[in-house]
């Protein structure tokens, strides 16, 4: 009889409960500037993000895309801890890691520092990534696995009676609801029979723009071109401010960097008309490094839609196509997790939610806007009134927290 393992990944670009972080845990986190492994991993993780994005683009053409690459990478890396032989190799290779070039211990240490760095308390930036593992109370997980996921991945582990499906479902959904402060309710509507383990991963993010938009200047009913024949009306935020930006003539797109007030930034990428597929196919860690080098600051007359976006994905088929095959098969080897036979991955779900507004993401304390003298000089206009790409990055680790495409900002 097969025993099923769920992997559920939650992503919230909104407020969530912050767990207590001890001083010892914080001070043990190495600075990313001192961690060569973490910098090496940032490129690998970015390329995984774009490869996964392209899979989503094929599976859901002409639709909004939104997900958290770093949370998926961290969850898969944690799962690889309990995998052995080809099951482990396939998971790590799908993430872009070569065990002959970077040993398992270095990979795990790198993810430990990554999670620690992301969870490091920052003033005016709320960012927290967490994991929870719900294990059937009759299952005998290995002590080393439990210690490793607790210490390296800051994972909470719960002993759960999955024989009582409704009670187990309630326990899991209640935990998720608490951790996301009620933003995700009833995440798992129906647990499969014989489920023995559920892995939940979430990342929560709230931040204020370094230069918030004045709500009084938001223009209601502005046109946004979805495709050649479809136009929708959206609230369009407007600001004249200095931003880092560039025109990439090789990729046929305009790139705008909007900083959050502390240690995070958003990249808005506007392909020239008809060039979205070209830009999507070219995105890579090298492109990000090129943009970071070439971005220049200057005055911009900026128009950005105000919108909310969410997306839910069944990652099973996509992960299979990316090379993670044994983990879903009867010959899956999770002997690093338990000596019990027959454990395999049954499902991997991912949900992401984002709110973009005048002040940043989600609710931020009120901001006072001072009257500014009218500027009579003409400045370049950048207007995001058609499909564009959106990346949100954490600065110190250069991690892609969120990656997406806005095709129709009216589809929440």
UniProtKB/Swiss-Prot annotation:
State the CDD domains in the record: serpinA7_TBG (cd19555)
Q: InterPro entries given for it?
A: Serpin_CS, Serpin_dom, Serpin_fam, Serpin_sf, Serpin_sf_1, Serpin_sf_2
The record, for Gene3D superfamilies, names: Alpha-1-antitrypsin, domain 1 (2.30.39.10), Antithrombin, subunit I, domain 2 (3.30.497.10), Serpins superfamily (2.10.310.10)
The identity of this protein, by name, is: Thyroxine-binding globulin
Listed GO CC annotations: extracellular space
Say yes or no: keyword Repeat present.
no
Q: Where in the cell is it found?
A: Secreted
Keyword set for this entry?
Glycoprotein, Secreted, Signal
Which residues are noted as glycosylation sites? 20, 35, 98, 164, 252
**Signal peptide boundaries:** 1-16
Q: Which residues form a coiled coil?
A: none
Native organism is: Sus scrofa
Instruction: List the Pfam families.
Output: Serpin (PF00079)
Give the protein's function: Major thyroid hormone transport protein in serum.
Expression tissues: Expressed by the liver and secreted in plasma.
What does the entry list as the binding residues for thyroxine? 292, 395
In Gene Ontology terms, what is one molecular function of this protein? serine-type endopeptidase inhibitor activity
Q: Which domain of life is it from?
A: Eukaryota
Q: Which family does it belong to?
A: Belongs to the serpin family.
